[in-house]
Structures are given as C-alpha cells and as structure tokens.
C-alpha cells in the first residue's frame, strides 16, 4: 500500500507543492490505482498477443513542413531577454533531490 511519505517524495521529484489535504487525497487515489494494477497483474494473458492499441489505426500524422514566419523578428524584439535567435528564460529546474 502506498503511504504519504511516498506521495511526498513523488511530489518533490515532480516539483509539486502539495498541502497536507492533497497528500492525503492523492495517497488514497494513487493507492486505488496501484491496487487496480495489482488486479491486472493477476490476469492470464499468455495467449494475448502484444499490442500498443486496442483498435488498429494507420499513420495519421503528417510530414513536418518548415515555413518562414514574417513576424519572427518582431517577436524576438519584444522579448525581455534573448540570446541570438533564442528566448532567454530563467532556470527553473535544479539538480537537487
């Protein structure tokens, strides 16, 4: 069973700040989800072929196309900070655990 310390650790790794009420709520909810996965592990699927989808589908994506954008320089000009052709943004992820 999942405990509150595990939920706090996952929240910390995901850079989420949870209140005590949210920790309790997510402990219950995530515990239910993990219990469901435990039930799925008990199913006999030896004769079921591996699949990635329940319904077969063909490739529905399109090829990427590069188009020049006339407003590019205008957008870069109003950026608070830029570095050449890139926006400069504050660092938000640290390497601390």
UniProtKB/Swiss-Prot annotation:
The keyword Protein biosynthesis applies. It comes from the Bacteria. GO terms for molecular function: asparaginyl-tRNA synthase (glutamine-hydrolyzing) activity; ATP binding; glutaminyl-tRNA synthase (glutamine-hydrolyzing) activity. It holds the Pfam family GatC. Keywords: ATP-binding, Ligase, Nucleotide-binding, Protein biosynthesis. It catalyses: L-glutamyl-tRNA(Gln) + L-glutamine + ATP + H2O = L-glutaminyl-tRNA(Gln) + L-glutamate + ADP + phosphate + H(+); L-aspartyl-tRNA(Asn) + L-glutamine + ATP + H2O = L-asparaginyl-tRNA(Asn) + L-glutamate + ADP + phosphate + 2 H(+). GO terms for biological process: glutaminyl-tRNAGln biosynthesis via transamidation; regulation of translational fidelity; translation. Disulfide bonds: none annotated. InterPro entries: Asp/Glu-ADT_sf_sub_c (IPR036113), GatC (IPR003837). Its EC number is 6.3.5.-. The keyword Protein biosynthesis applies. Heterotrimer of A, B and C subunits. Allows the formation of correctly charged Asn-tRNA(Asn) or Gln-tRNA(Gln) through the transamidation of misacylated Asp-tRNA(Asn) or Glu-tRNA(Gln) in organisms which lack either or both of asparaginyl-tRNA or glutaminyl-tRNA synthetases. The reaction takes place in the presence of glutamine and ATP through an activated phospho-Asp-tRNA(Asn) or phospho-Glu-tRNA(Gln). PANTHER family: GLUTAMYL-TRNA(GLN) AMIDOTRANSFERASE SUBUNIT C, MITOCHONDRIAL. Belongs to the GatC family. This is Aspartyl/glutamyl-tRNA(Asn/Gln) amidotransferase subunit C. It comes from Cyanothece sp. (strain PCC 7425 / ATCC 29141).
């Amino acid at each position: 069973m999942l405990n509150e310390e595990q939920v706090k650790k996952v929240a910390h790794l995901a850079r989420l700040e949870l209140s005590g009420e949210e920790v309790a709520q997510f402990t219950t909810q995530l515990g239910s989800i993990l219990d469901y996965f435990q039930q799925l592990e008990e199913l006999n699927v030896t004769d079921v072929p591996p699949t990635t989808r329940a319904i077969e589908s063909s490739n529905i994506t399109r090829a990427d196309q590069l188009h020049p954008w006339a407003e590019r320089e205008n957008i870069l000009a109003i950026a608070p900070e830029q570095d050449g052709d890139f926006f400069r943004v504050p660092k938000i992820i640290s390497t601390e655990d």
